[in-house]
Amino acid sequence: MTILSAITSISRPNKSSKSVISSNGGSSLSMGSNSVSCFNACGGGSSYSYSSSYSGSGLDYSYKANYSSSTGYNSSVIIASSTCHCS
């Protein structure tokens, strides 16, 4: 499976950045790949959260995730595109 990702530069003072992740054939992506993309977009901070939604081919996906250095991951489902909120 080929995973393509593009991370745009931080465009808002509140350190909110956007990460776009896609996969061939709508295959699900691993939590690890998503986390790394958001982690890098946030500059490697100790915590972040992001959410996304995707609609295509009659299927709707949604994904929400939170990461904290003290509690670890809290995540679910599939991600196609996301907005990272850095803290």
Curated annotation (Swiss-Prot):
Residues 1-13 have a biased composition (Polar residues). Residues 1-31 are annotated as: Disordered. InterPro entries: HssA/B-like_chaperone (IPR050533), HssA/B-related (IPR008455). GO terms for biological process: sorocarp development. Residues 14-31 have a biased composition (Low complexity). It holds the Pfam family Coiled. Belongs to the hssA/B family. PANTHER family: HSSA/B-LIKE PROTEIN 1-RELATED-RELATED (PTHR31059), HSSA_B-LIKE PROTEIN 1-RELATED (PTHR31059:SF5). This is HssA/B-like protein 58. It comes from Dictyostelium discoideum. The lineage of its organism: Eukaryota, Amoebozoa, Evosea, Eumycetozoa, Dictyostelia.
